Amino acid sequence: MSRRVKTLLIILAVLLVLAIVAVVILNHPTFGRRMSKERKARIEASLNWRDGMFQNQIPTPQFSGDKSMFRALWEFLTEGKKDRTPKEAVPAVKTDLKALPTDRDWLVWFGHSSYLFCLDGKRYLVDPVLKLEFPVTVMMRPFKGTDIYSTDDMPVIDMLIITHEHWDHLDYATLRDLKDKVKHVVCPLGVAEYLEYWGYDTKHITEMDWYEKVDNITCLPSRHFSNRMFKRNQTLWAAFLVESSGKKVYIGGDGGYDQRFKEVFEQYGCVDLALMENGQYNKDWANIHLMPDDLEKAILDLKAKQVFTVHHDKFSLAPHAWTEPDSIAHDIAERNSISLLDQPIGTVVEF
């Protein structure tokens, strides 16, 4: 056998192995499954579905600079500040969540956009990412000290709220292990396909379009996008408003600045607590994540009585210093006399 033929066979063998590995990985449950015809029909009937995908309320190019998508991604991977990750463990407190009383309103943050709050006697868990497994660990690694909570620590959850399908908000391993503790799930259109595939009972899932209200929860617009594999914007992204007999909590989800924050105030009045995205921003994707100046405008538009910022302190998904979002939030609060609830991971914050 000639050297040329041997080389060709080796190349073919390597390609075959890579193809097999790709098939195995892409068939992992974390990637979901093909959407059912019934769900697809409901999605396509949405007023927010146009030209084969969900659309934002205003035009939203994913990349806002003059660079190509590939150049922006390359710079993100190869450049940026050296202090994107902490050198020491991030401060965190281990709280017995099951022992927390339900006769008071409180919040416990787990880093990034995962948090548990109690409102009017009910426990709400938002975007829990607590138990990363392969292949997600290839893309995201939590900062040291931020992974002290597991699904075993969670109490019974009255309502699980998912804002969108991105990896840092919808985690297969976490939701798989939480299933028996969750009474009901609320999510934007299309996201329930993942949950049903992962074992959640359809009867206990409510999919919502923007401005739909079910019981005390209203699904509201955000300015973002979705893609978990290759095709973009096939599931919806959202913010949520949770109301009780005396208070309102705004769950901002992910998304760039637009008129929606003013509209929330105009339609629903002052919210008692606003959970605002603050982190993983960059000028190259300023349309789909809140930049620091936009965070300030959004908070002022909302006129929230109290603010807690999330989307930071756990993963490095943008080229800013990991401590920068906290500093920005404090500066905004000081300039505008805003009540900022800023506590370490795991701390019980009453509101």
Q: What is each PLM-predicted segment?
A:
Residues 130-147, 227-231, 282-288, 316:
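Acidic/histidine-rich helix-loop elements
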Residues 46, 138-186, 269-275:
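Active-site metal-binding motif and surrounding structural segment of the metallo-beta-lactamase
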Residues 23-45, 49, 56, 159, ...:
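Cap/insert and terminal regions of metallo-dependent hydrolase folds
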Residues 114-118, 215-270, 286, 290-294:
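Catalytic core of the metallo-beta-lactamase
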Residues 128-130, 165, 222-224, 253-255, ...:
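Active-site metal-binding loops of divalent metal-dependent hydrolases
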